[in-house]
């Protein structure tokens, strides 16, 4: 079973059987090309020779034995590096740094690791679900991103954190402009222009594909008679007779809209409000919603302090609106829900899939169904173990469902689908094989993932809330 056991095979099986093994090996592999010295080896000290060095590199990954179980879960597998390979390169870089050996090799590894190890890492941490000891290689990469950030990067991040509303307006405006351009200029021409701009700016200009549409902004609940923050708590339930809920529309859902379909689906925020009201809830949405963010984008880019600042502002807002957690809080993006749940001292936030299944679907009447729906379990939904809830909601809206099995994380990873689109294209390269002929729509619980899947799957992907609203309309 390997070099560590090879010196003891004869002791285990005896000289006669051991000799037969050598004769069989000689017949099948006379040149000694297949695993030479791995299973059979005359050197009784081979198990203590040529040992792989595993220097301490990062406490997050130091337990890794490089077994490779993580590799199939990684969206950059067969593109750049896998989690195992990222760890191996990290260890080699640390060894070279400590020993001073071969500075030129270290410089090359440091330089090449930027793209192969960091830029093309989605930081989805699905590797941890496959790892026997739960190692989060993505967290290691986020830490390295933070270590590589300079004064200019932190200044830009601080500006973005302090002007979140302006940034959101700018991004939504950019996508709106691209939408308008496609209305008067052929889409291939628009994409050619953006690709030229990307080449001239070393990929600093985002790629805006035809699958990306401008978002709806803030939704409009039916009853906004009172600003909950004026008194510090929402309207008493006795005044309406309806249970109340705080709904936080995630920033991707506000900035990026759903693809147009023949079913007239609502964008995610308005679909969520409509569903919650249809199920009998009074919906409370933050009045000053523009710029509110869970902080995950800052953290994934390597700006933990700015992330904490942004997260704290949202947590304070949600705490006030929910009367310190007395009212349930729900958001529509699995990524945001997971991040908000992990904040120290944060109030509980439910993801849309679990809340819609438990609290909304039982109060609805399903009036129409699709023949088949494709289901994508995004990385945060997998880490939250939401697959059963997502599939149950999809089954409520369709006669059959097709769970995408050829992809794990779609590789869109926040804005990587805009700046490193090749990662999304690689991760979804086989998704068409998962979609039945009678399937005309797919669902996801993150709007950016839905955009990437729409581009590469051949059918539009929308939010679960949008589909459930249509089915119960």
Segments (PLM) and residue ranges:
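Non-heme iron-sulfur electron-transfer modules
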Residues: 40-46, 77-113, 134-160, 462-469
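Iron-sulfur cluster-binding electron-transfer modules in prokaryotic oxidoreductases
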Residues: 29, 138-473
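Iron-sulfur cluster-binding cysteine motifs and their immediate structural context
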Residues: 32-38, 69-93, 120-147, 339, ...
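Cys/His-enriched microdomains
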Residues: 59-68, 72, 119-122, 126-129, ...
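Short beta-alpha connecting loops at secondary-structure transitions
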Residues: 3-12, 50-59, 75, 99-106, ...
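Ferredoxin-like iron-sulfur electron-transfer modules
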Residues: 46-66, 100-123, 376
